[in-house]
């Protein structure tokens, strides 16, 4: 509907950019792609851009496995292996704090703990605060980020990048195709180092299958 309105208001050419693996409404994206010629009343040209300049080889190879039919190429830049860390709920703040310290020791300035939901981000920030640890919570009301350690939801992390990323508690809560897209978004935020944690019995089948 939005493209139809724009096309009728402004008689010009359009360039549309997007990543199907980062959409949170997969059906809407498919409908748009399949009907674009009808909406614009003319033939559209589809160009696939599949080279990333952001992440290291190890990170790209990992999220290629997570994404739906993803085959992203990368600039040849080696980095550290993707890390998987099991935690216990009663001690995970300490584990996360240790991971942050290791990231800082490697010279990573911008570090994000990425949660699945805004509520998870808020609860986790409160747990850090109760432990006497100062950490930035980026939510819908945040208008500035000081390039330090932060807690942020996947939705709010879209479009951002960080030296190091810790994806929080990738357990059985990640199971659907939309969850696969969410996980892909989280992992593609990382430039140099990516760690996934889990405080449940097993990591999500989306990453172990």
Regions found by a protein language model. Name each.
Residues 1-209:
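Conserved helicase motor core of SF1/SF2 NTP-dependent helicases
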């Amino acid at each position: 509907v939005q493209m139809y309105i724009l096309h009728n208001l402004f008689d010009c050419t359009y360039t549309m950019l997007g990543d199907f693996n980062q959409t949170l409404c997969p059906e809407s994206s498919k409908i748009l792609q399949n009907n674009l010629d009808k909406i614009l009343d003319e033939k559209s040209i589809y160009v696939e851009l599949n080279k990333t300049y952001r992440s290291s080889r190890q990170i790209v190879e990992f999220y290629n496995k997570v994404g739906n039919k993803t085959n992203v190429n990368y600039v040849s830049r080696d980095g550290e292996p993707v890390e998987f860390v099991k935690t216990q709920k009663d001690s995970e703040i300490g584990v996360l704090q240790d991971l942050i310290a290791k990231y800082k020791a490697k010279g990573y300035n911008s570090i994000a703990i990425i949660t699945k939901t805004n509520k998870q981000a808020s609860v986790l920030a409160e747990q850090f605060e109760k432990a006497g640890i100062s950490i930035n919570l980026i939510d819908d009301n945040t208008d500035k980020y000081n390039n330090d350690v932060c807690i942020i939801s996947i939705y709010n992390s879209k479009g951002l990048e960080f030296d190091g990323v810790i994806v929080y508690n990738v357990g059985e809560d990640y199971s659907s195709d939309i969850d696969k897209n969410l996980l892909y978004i989280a992992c593609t935020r990382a430039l140099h180092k990516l760690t996934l944690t889990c405080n449940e019995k097993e990591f999500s089948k989306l990453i172990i299958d």
